């Protein structure tokens, strides 16, 4: 048994302009090769494009998109007696948001388009409306969990 104490859970910091934790989480996920200023640039351009497209508060669109993509349940591979089962597990809110952000960025990178800011803004607007690849990914995950409901007792 470890004598070391448990670590305190780190809370996500908020970004300098919008004072929003979700924006900062997005920036940290979009970050590549330590280029944080470029990541901020991409996010802020995407937010401006959302403002132009929807003519509503872009942060509410972002919140709505992340809320729409956040999964409640996922499947985890579990090996039981020589065979691997996909076991459905519930997901906490923090992990769900992290997954949602990862899926949104994956879907926006896959999109055809000019630049990342344009693709990200389009994906966020679509996700807020309830369509797009990220929403499809969430629904697919929920379907997988529902199909493997029989293995829920393997948790």
UniProtKB/Swiss-Prot annotation:
Q: What is its main location?
A: plastid
Q: Which CDD domains match?
A: uS7_Chloroplast (cd14871)
Location in the cell: Plastid, Chloroplast
Q: Which is a GO BP term held by this UniProt record?
A: translation
Q: Does the keyword Chloroplast apply?
A: yes
Q: Which controlled-vocabulary keywords does the entry list?
A: Chloroplast, Plastid, Ribonucleoprotein, Ribosomal protein, RNA-binding, rRNA-binding
> Which positions carry the signal peptide feature in this UniProt record?
none
Which InterPro entries would you find in this protein's record?
A: Ribosomal_uS7, Ribosomal_uS7_bac/org-type, Ribosomal_uS7_CS, Ribosomal_uS7_dom, Ribosomal_uS7_dom_sf
What the entry lists under Pfam families is as follows: Ribosomal_S7 (PF00177)
Family, similarity comment? Belongs to the universal ribosomal protein uS7 family.
**Which PANTHER family would you find in this protein's record?**
RIBOSOMAL PROTEIN S7
What the protein does comes down to:
One of the primary rRNA binding proteins, it binds directly to 16S rRNA where it nucleates assembly of the head domain of the 30S subunit.
UniProt protein name: Small ribosomal subunit protein uS7cz/uS7cy
According to its UniProt entry, this protein's organism is Piper cenocladum
């Amino acid at each position: 048994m470890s004598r070391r104490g448990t670590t305190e859970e780190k809370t996500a910091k908020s970004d300098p302009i919008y004072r929003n934790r979700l924006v900062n989480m997005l920036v940290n996920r979009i970050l590549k090769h330590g280029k944080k200023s470029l990541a901020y640039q991409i996010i802020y351009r995407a937010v401006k494009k959302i403002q132009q497209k929807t003519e509503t508060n872009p942060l509410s669109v972002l919140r709505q998109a992340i809320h729409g993509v956040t999964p409640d349940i996922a499947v985890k591979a579990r090996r039981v007696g020589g065979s691997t089962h996909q076991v459905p597990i519930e997901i906490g809110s923090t992990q769900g948001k992290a997954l949602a952000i990862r899926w949104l960025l994956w879907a926006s990178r896959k999109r055809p388009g000019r630049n990342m800011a344009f693709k990200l803004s389009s994906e966020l607007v679509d996700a807020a409306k309830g369509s797009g690849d990220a929403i499809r990914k969430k629904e697919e995950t929920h379907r997988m969990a529902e199909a493997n409901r029989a293995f829920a007792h393997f948790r």
